[in-house]
Amino acid sequence: MCNCKKNIKVDESYVSFKDIDCFENACLVIDNLLRILKEPKNTNAYWEKFIEKIPEAYYTRDSKKDPSEALLYLVCSCTSNIMELFEEIDDEEAIDAMSKCEQECC
């Protein structure tokens, strides 16, 4: 254990997240995902179950209805699967949205 006496102010601990809208980043990922999944050839039982887990806050675009950040958690916990689909489809817009969300928020 370190005996250092570094004081970290609470308002400084998450400075790197300042001005980043992780809810909106997650919404953009889901926007792209739902657009891609409209094509029947791109969907399967996994994605059908995934869609059921999308919280109401996404559909209302109201982050206040998502205080536990369920949407961000859903996106971040499935990053590999989402990115695999986006890359398989070769959708640059979707890949960019997922990359941004992953880098800034996950």
UniProtKB/Swiss-Prot annotation:
Q: Where would you find the membrane-spanning parts of this chain? A: none
Q: Which UniProt keywords apply?
A: Nitrogen fixation
The highest taxon in the source lineage is: Bacteria
Biological process (GO) annotations held by this record are: nitrogen fixation
Family of the protein in this entry: Belongs to the CowN family.
Recorded hits in HAMAP family, A to Z, give: CowN (MF_02117)
What functional role does this protein have?
Answer: Is required to sustain N(2)-dependent growth in the presence of low levels of carbon monoxide (CO). Probably acts by protecting the N(2) fixation ability of the nitrogenase complex, which is inactivated in the presence of CO.
Q: What is this protein called?
A: N(2)-fixation sustaining protein CowN
List the source organism.
Answer: Denitrovibrio acetiphilus (strain DSM 12809 / NBRC 114555 / N2460)
Q: What is the lineage of its organism?
A: Bacteria, Pseudomonadati, Deferribacterota, Deferribacteres, Deferribacterales
Q: Which gene encodes it?
A: cowN
